[in-house]
Amino acid sequence: MERGREMTENSYNTPCGCIHYFVNIIDKQKITLVFLPGLTADHRLFEKQTEYFEKKQNVFVWDAPSHALSRPFTNNYSLSDMAEWLYEILVKEEIYNPIIIGQSMGGYLAQMYMELYPDKIKGFISIDSAPLQKSYMTAMEIWLLERAEPLYKIYPWKALLRAGSRGCAETDYGQNLMRKMMMSYNPDHKEYARLVADREKAKDILKRVNYYRFTGYALQFRQEPSGSDYIEKAEVYYRTQIVYGFSIAKCIEAPHD
């Protein structure tokens, strides 16, 4: 880990590969902030957050399976498999009732974790993610999700680097960081395409059609004035989100930094 003087790197073996993660426990009686980066991002995505919190709270962040240090890793695993591995790692580290902060795909994983272990989580913060439900997606989004791999394979790598970094962050720091994380898949463009278009994860998303009752309260954060379309999107999110009596903060349309 490039920063994180207090963080300790550990690993966990699964049938599909070895997961690497970083953890700092200062008091087992305190809550633990569990940071889950999104697709193609890794633990570096949250380096500023872990640097700030690591001396104040228990902190955990991982490189998700098939990402960064958690490679090589076979791709025949599902989102529910990832949630089970996450739970097993947290048990191993004696982390109970965490607050999970999930960015993009990390938010999907957090929702899967809540579905499987509803009494093993203290709170959920979603950063630029969406409900884990097919009903939330448009027909075009579903069509693209099912055909993503060939589309990414024909996308010129340099153009993809430029579009990916600019589309994920607004600051120079955030864009440079995202570019650096994407470059860890260079020069194997096909590996990046397979990761982005993982069919097992897509199946997990597309088969989930149920709605969930919102029982907590939500906070919306945005860096610019919210238009009615964003407010409507947020309200849909709140109506369908899995919440078990704790509060939820939704950073809607937030840049990934």
Would you name each region that the model predicts?
Residues 16, 60-101:
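Active-site loop/oxyanion-hole signature of alpha/beta-hydrolase fold enzymes
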Residues 135-136, 155-212:
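Conserved alpha/beta-hydrolase catalytic His-Asp/Glu region
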Residues 194-245:
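Conserved serine/cysteine hydrolase catalytic core
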